[in-house]
Structure formats: C-alpha cells, structure tokens
Amino acid sequence: MSSTDASTETSTQEVGTVDMRLEVVTLPVSDVDRAKRFYQSLGWRLDADIAAGGEMRLVQMTPPHSACSIHFGKGFTAMEPGSLDRLYLAVKDIDAAREDLIARGVDVSEVEEQPRPPGLPDVPGRSYFAYALFRDPDGNGWLLQEITTRLPGREWED
C-alpha cells in the first residue's frame, strides 16, 4: 500500500469553484417503518415521508445539526439492505455521543483510538482518530468520529 502526502497534493490540485454540498445519502433498508422508528429513536428529524402508490415510498431524515440527510424507502434503490458501511457522523465529544446512543437503546462499540499517522498536521486531542461503531436494524454501519478541531484545509471559505 502506498501513501501520499495530502498536504503536498492539495497544494498543487486545482480546486473546483462551483458550490457543491453533499445533500443526501441513500440507505438500503428492508423495512421502511422499522428504519423510520430506529432513526427517530436516535433523535433524527423526520423531513419527509412520501408514498406514491403502493410501489414507492421515500423517507428523509436528518441527524441533529447535520447539513446532510438520509433517504430510505421502497422502490428507489437496488442496493441490498444493510450493504452500506462506514457512514461517518462527526461529533465534538465521542464519549457523550456514545452515551446518548446507548441511553436510546443502541448497541455502540467501545471508543477506539487510532494512532496518528506520521506526516499529518497536528490537531489537539483525539480529532479524527477516535471512533465508535453502531449499526441500524438492517446492518448499515455508522461510525462516530470525534472532530474537535478541523485539519488545515478542511474548512471551505464562503
């Protein structure tokens, strides 16, 4: 496996100027109502629940303070239920986020801290290198990732 110094690569990369923001991620689920109950139990906002006949249904939900939502439903993805893994949720305090999810009845792994690879800019605390995993009822995997300070270049200027 090879690695690239991202700070060198990004300094020479031509960055796009068109404003593009990730809006929605589609989750494959087997039971729409069960998934809706699960994500509501996490405290996620229900944005829409739209049915078109008996063949199509779309539910949109948004995690607290997130600019990106999730879609799931019936009749609009060929992905196998539970096939998405490593969907990241950035949190400022991973221990508090983990405790909140456990209090809501979610099975969450212990917090795992990864060593900081050499060559990355230093950020305080465990930013980017502390994780905890949980799964929805279909097995789609979510990673809590603690980020208290963004790495240089990770903030877009308005």
Walk through the language-model features, giving the residues of each.
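Short loop segments at secondary-structure junctions
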Residues: 29-30, 64-66, 91-94, 137-139, ...
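Residue-level recognition of conserved beta-strand positions in structured domain cores
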Residues: 63, 72-74, 146
